[in-house]
Amino acid sequence: MAAQQQGRGSGAAVLAAAVLLCVLLHAHVAESAVFTVGDRGGWSFNTNTWTNGKRFKAGDVLVFKYDSTAHNVVAVNAAGYKGCSAPGGAKVYKSGNDRVTLARGTNYFICSIPGHCQAGMKIGVTAA
């Protein structure tokens, strides 16, 4: 009988831990914000000031909306951002409705269509 009582207690503890884990995971997901790059104008030229006044956290999602026949989005490093060049192996998005989850630190994005980045189609987003 004592063994049965102990078994029920252990089961309740496991259930409580599982519920707590679900609540914590849900809270983390609920904290993430979704931002549309360029707001209503979408991903376009001169969106490099779009980040002004916004606060980003690791796990937040950027949505890039654009004409996929004219533009793309490439995740680059600081050198790629500064030089408007996509290094080999860079992640290229081209659906016209791309979702990118921010990592902690500065995340850089450019359009790699010739001349577009140089014309201001690039952003750097710093996530805390």
Language-model segments: which ranges?
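Beta-strand acidic-aromatic groove motif in beta-rich domains, primarily in extracellular
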Residues: 71-77
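Extracellular/periplasmic metallocenter environments
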Residues: 2-43, 69-71, 82-128
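N-terminal "mature-chain" segments and other terminal, solvent-exposed stretches
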Residues: 42-45, 53
